[in-house]
Each structure stands twice: as structure tokens, then as C-alpha cells.
A protein has these predicted regions:
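Active-site anion-handling motifs in enzyme catalytic cores
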Residues: 1-363
Length: 363
């Protein structure tokens, strides 16, 4: 059976990064043994990754006594060359481009060049379900073009991102966000009304604008006697959501003190709509039958929502905060049955596309 080395070193404390890494590993493990290196990640992260019924998901560090960091790198590469490995893969999410300071630049260049030189040419390097963002002119354009060109395949999770770099890199393709591989996907979830809405936000600079828009949205749902919960899925969002709660308290809003953990993701099936500026709050909401609506700023962390949603959904399900209208959200809510039916179809297309592409890449 094929063997994949998988470096699961990603953002810590973000359930979104955990879930897309988990779903990707499980999908890869349908076609190969996946040896996962979780070194440096929190214990709960490793626990989720290795809590699986698939015997093809294996703990690389436990089996080989090595991890892909520091002085161990050459030892790991030797194991991959001599141990029958065919693929070198890493977690999905944003790919950090090469940039200053010099020390960081040199280390990243070496980190990319060493496996490219040392690994057997038969070992392919994949990075699937990611975003690219680097300058299109000057020194860093050329060096990042070289850097990302070392991969055999880079799968970009939005068609906008693909269009931007299509003429720059010849190793890129489109692949949907790994959240579409959510394992508890069920058409029945798209046919139930709950008369409940969820809000969830990360910190924003346009705070006063956001508050004004949320007050208008809450006023509409209060008039309709629709219950609204304020929730958070990333620990660092808690304090910001508490601040929102203080300023929106008179709007009949309920704050959920407990963070939505990986084991709690099906809580989203209790909502008709999820309004957020967190991509994986929105996508997991969509996978559980809720209408995802992105209320976003122009920050690059939030702009990816516009890019992904434009690639996925046949109706516009996001707006920039300054241009947002409660009337648009009201229309989506009033037409929720037909909107959710269309979302289900869109999700099926993305899910199937993702599964077929991964199967093709590893077969």
C-alpha cells in the first residue's frame, strides 16, 4: 500500500484548522497509509487526529521515534527515501509566503530546498486546500514563484486565488476547502426549520460599523421572535464576543459561554442561519444545514470568505460590513427553504469534486 508522510503542523487553538486537517487525513487514508507527524501541536489536537476507526492513520513519531523538526529533518527524509513513502504532504490553510526578516527568509528557503534536493524524485510533494498570497512584482515575486514551484501540486481553495496565480505557477489547481468533507453530512438537515440564528465574530477594526449593522439585523429577528445566539469556535474570539454581548445586550441576544469544540460541531444543525466572519464557522454551519452568511471586512483573513463563497455558492452569501443590508439577510431568511435547498446542491458538488480529485491524485 502507498505511504504518505503528513506534517500536521498548523495554527494552534483554531478548531477550523484542526477540522480541515482531520478531514483531509481521513480522506487520504482511503487510498494510502498516512503517517502523521503532530509534533509541536497541543495534546487535544493529536487526540482528535488519532481518534479514528481507520487503521491507515498512523502516528509517525510513535512508530519511527522522529519528528520533522530541526536536526531530525535529514533523519526523517532518509526514512522517507528508504521506507517506501510516495508522498510528502502538509496541513491545509494559508501558505505563508517568503518575506523578511532575513533569518526567517533563509530558514524557509532551506526548509523548502532540503526536501526537494534530498527526497527521491518519485516522492511527490502535495499541498492541498490552501491559499496563496504573495507580491506580483519585485524580488519577492521571483523568490516566491521559485519557492511554491518546488511542490508537485498546490490545490487552491478558491477559483479567485487560482485565477490570480494561474499565469505565475504551473503546478496549481482548484480543490474545495476540506470542510466540505465533514463526515456527518445529511440531506435531512437542510429540511428542518428551527427559528434560531447564530452570530460568531473574530475581532474587527470597524467595530462601530459592525455594531450598527448587527443592531439592525437583531431588530429584524426580534420582530420575528427568532432566537439569536452569540457563539464562538476559537478561544481568542471569546473576549471580542463578550464585548459584542455588552453592546448588544438589549437586543435579546444569548451568549454561549462554552466554546464550540471539535466534538460539538453538530450544534450548528440547530440554526437556520449562521452569520460570521470566520470561514469555518460558516462552512461547518453550511454542512449542518444552516444558511452561512459572511459579514466581512477587507482584511485578507476575511477576504478569503468572499473568494471561497464566490467559488462555491450559486447565490451571494456574503457582504462587506459597510455595504451590508439587513434587508438582504431578511430575504434569505424568508426564503430559507429554497435557499437551503440550493446550498445543499452546491455543497454536494464541492464535496464530490474534492473526493474525486483526491482519489485521482493518490491512485
Amino acid at each position: 500500500m502507498m505511504k504518505i508522510f503528513y506534517s500536521a503542523y498548523t495554527c494552534q487553538g483554531n478548531i477550523g484548522d484542526l477540522l480541515i486537517t482531520k478531514y483531509q487525513i481521513e480522506e487520504y487514508a482511503k487510498y494510502a497509509e498516512v503517517f502523521v507527524d503532530c509534533h509541536g501541536m497541543p495534546q487535544y489536537f493529536s487526540k482528535v487526529i488519532f481518534d479514528t476507526n481507520n487503521p491507515n492513520v498512523k502516528d509517525f513519531e510513535k512508530i519511527y521515534g522522529l519528528y520533522y523538526r530541526g536536526k531530525n529533518i535529514f533523519k526523517v527524509l532518509r526514512v522517507l527515501n528508504n521506507g517506501g513513502f510516495g508522498f510528502f504532504c502538509s496541513s491545509p490553510g494559508p501558505r505563508v509566503p517568503l518575506n523578511l526578516p532575513v533569518r526567517s527568509l533563509v530558514l524557509k528557503m532551506l526548509g523548502a530546498l532540503i526536501p526537494y534536493v534530498v527526497l527521491n524524485k518519485r516522492i511527490k510533494r502535495y499541498s492541498l486546500g490552501v491559499d496563496l498570497q504573495f507580491e506580483r512584482t519585485g524580488f519577492f515575486y521571483w523568490i516566491n514563484r521559485w519557492y511554491f514551484g518546488l511542490f508537485d501540486i498546490i490545490g487552491l481553495r478558491s477559483k479567485e486565488n487560482l485565477s490570480t496565480y494561474r499565469g505565475v505557477l504551473n503546478n496549481i489547481c482548484y480543490i474545495p476547502d476540506m470542510a466540505f468533507l465533514f463526515p456527518y453530512f445529511d440531506e435531512k438537515k437542510y429540511r428542518c426549520n428551527h427559528d434560531k440564528i447564530a452570530l460568531s465574530f473574530r475581532n474587527v477594526t470597524e467595530y462601530n460599523v459592525l455594531i450598527d449593522k448587527l443592531k439592525n439585523i437583531l431588530r429584524y429577528f426580534n420582530d420575528k421572535e427568532i432566537h439569536v445566539d452569540l457563539i464562538y469556535q476559537v478561544e481568542e474570539d471569546k473576549s471580542f464576543c463578550e464585548r459584542l454581548m455588552c453592546d448588544l445586550a438589549e437586543n435579546n441576544l444569548s451568549f454561549k459561554e462554552k466554546m464550540v469544540a471539535y466534538s460539538d460541531l453538530e450544534v450548528y444543525e440547530n440554526y437556520d442561519m449562521v452569520i460570521s466572519n470566520r470561514l469555518h464557522v460558516l462552512l461547518i454551519g453550511a454542512m449542518n444545514g444552516a444558511i452561512p452568511y459572511g459579514l466581512i471586512s477587507h482584511d485578507k483573513k476575511e477576504k478569503k470568505i468572499a473568494d471561497v463563497f464566490s467559488s462555491v455558492f450559486s447565490c451571494k452569501l456574503f457582504s462587506y460590513v459597510e455595504n451590508s443590508s439587513s434587508a438582504v439577510i431578511a430575504t434569505l431568511f424568508c426564503e430559507r427553504d429554497s435557499v437551503r435547498s440550493q446550498i445543499y446542491k452546491n455543497v454536494c458538488v464541492q464535496r464530490n469534486y474534492c473526493e474525486r480529485l483526491i482519489e485521482r491524485l493518490f491512485n
